[in-house]
């Protein structure tokens, strides 16, 4: 189980929790979105809200995939491929949120 330190709250962020990575390091989903809301104020609030819902869905999907049990090598490969695809999508959404400006 991988474990990181959230750069906003300094608490641990571990496999099985909703967190992502920015250029600053690991960050809990809730910490990241709250920080961006505060930083942006009312500017880009609607766009942030939309992207936050997307990122939440992607991170939830990743957590659901972690619970899937596979018993064959093919199943494990397919699961790993799907996990990487969703992980990449979550990374792209995180970058879009990070790029939002006032």
Language-model segments: residues:
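Intrinsically disordered, low-complexity regulatory segments
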Residues: 1-23, 29-102
